[in-house]
C-alpha cells in the first residue's frame, strides 16, 4: 500500500525535474507580450478661463518584448538575465473645462496618454515548484529612452439652448523626459509556466525608485508575455 502511495509522489517529482532543462544548460528565450501600467500620483490639471479641471491616471496597455538568457544552476533552480523593451505610462479620461448649464466657449481634451519608453535589464532567480512551474524574483534596472504626453485638444461652443458646436481637434505632443529620472529600479516578482519549449510568464515590478523628479510618482507595471526556449549550450 505504501508503495502505491509513494509512487505518484515520486512521479510528480520526476516530472518536476524533467520539465526543466538539465543542469548546466544555457537557454535563449525571445518573448513578446503586453504591459498594464500606471504612474501613481500623476494627476494632470488644466486651468482655462479660471476654471481648473483635473484627471487622475489610469492603467493602460503597452507593448513589451525582448529576450532572456537562462542558466540552469540546479535541477530546480535557474538564473536569468534579460534585455527588454517596455512601453509604459498611463492614460486619462476625456475632460473639458465646460461649466454645466452655462453657455460659452470651452476646451476639451481627449485621447490623453503618457507614453514612457524603457529598456529594462532584469536579473531573476527561478525556483521550480512543479512540472514547468516556476516562481521568479530578482532586481531590474530600467533606462528611460523617451517620454511624451499626447492628447487631442478641441475648442467647442455651448449655445444657450444646450446645443454644442465642435471645432476641429488638433493633436498635442509634449516632451516630458526632462521631468523624469532616466534610471529606474524595481523588484520583479512573477510566475512562469513552461510547456514543451513555450514559456508563459506573468510578473509585477515593485518600484524602488521615483519616476518623476519633483512629484515623486512611481511606475506600476504588470507584464504578461509568451516566449520560446532554445537550448543553445548543454
Which role fits each region the language model picked out?
Residues 20-70, 231:
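Short glycine/proline- and aromatic-enriched beta-strand/turn motifs that initiate or cap beta-hairpins
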Residues 170-234:
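Predominantly the C-terminal beta-signal and adjacent terminal strand-loop region
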Residues 30-34, 63-71, 83-85, 121-129, ...:
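Residues on the lipid-exposed face of transmembrane beta-strands in outer-membrane beta-barrel proteins
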Amino acid at each position: 500500500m505504501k508503495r502505491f502511495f509513494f509512487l505518484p509522489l515520486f512521479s510528480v517529482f520526476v516530472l518536476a525535474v524533467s520539465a526543466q532543462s538539465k543542469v548546466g544548460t544555457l537557454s535563449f528565450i525571445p518573448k513578446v507580450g503586453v504591459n498594464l501600467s500606471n504612474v501613481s500620483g500623476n494627476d494632470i490639471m488644466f486651468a482655462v478661463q479660471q476654471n481648473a479641471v483635473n484627471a487622475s491616471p489610469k492603467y493602460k496597455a503597452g507593448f513589451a518584448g525582448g529576450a532572456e538568457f537562462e542558466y540552469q544552476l540546479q535541477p530546480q533552480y535557474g538564473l536569468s538575465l534579460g534585455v527588454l523593451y517596455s512601453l509604459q505610462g498611463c492614460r486619462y479620461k476625456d475632460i473639458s473645462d465646460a461649466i454645466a448649464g452655462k453657455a460659452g466657449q470651452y476646451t476639451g481634451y481627449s485621447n490623453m496618454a503618457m507614453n514612457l519608453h524603457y529598456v529594462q535589464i532584469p536579473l531573476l532567480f527561478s525556483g521550480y515548484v512543479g512540472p514547468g512551474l516556476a516562481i521568479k524574483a530578482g532586481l531590474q534596472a530600467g533606462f528611460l529612452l523617451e517620454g511624451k504626453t499626447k492628447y487631442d485638444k478641441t475648442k467647442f461652443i455651448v449655445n444657450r439652448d444646450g446645443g454644442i458646436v465642435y471645432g476641429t481637434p488638433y493633436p498635442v505632443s509634449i516632451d516630458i523626459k526632462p521631468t523624469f529620472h532616466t534610471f529606474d529600479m524595481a523588484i520583479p516578482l512573477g510566475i512562469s509556466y513552461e510547456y514543451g519549449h513555450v514559456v508563459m510568464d506573468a510578473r509585477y515590478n515593485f518600484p524602488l525608485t521615483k519616476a518623476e523628479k519633483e512629484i515623486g510618482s512611481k511606475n506600476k507595471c504588470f507584464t504578461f508575455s509568451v516566449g520560446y526556449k532554445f537550448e543553445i549550450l548543454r
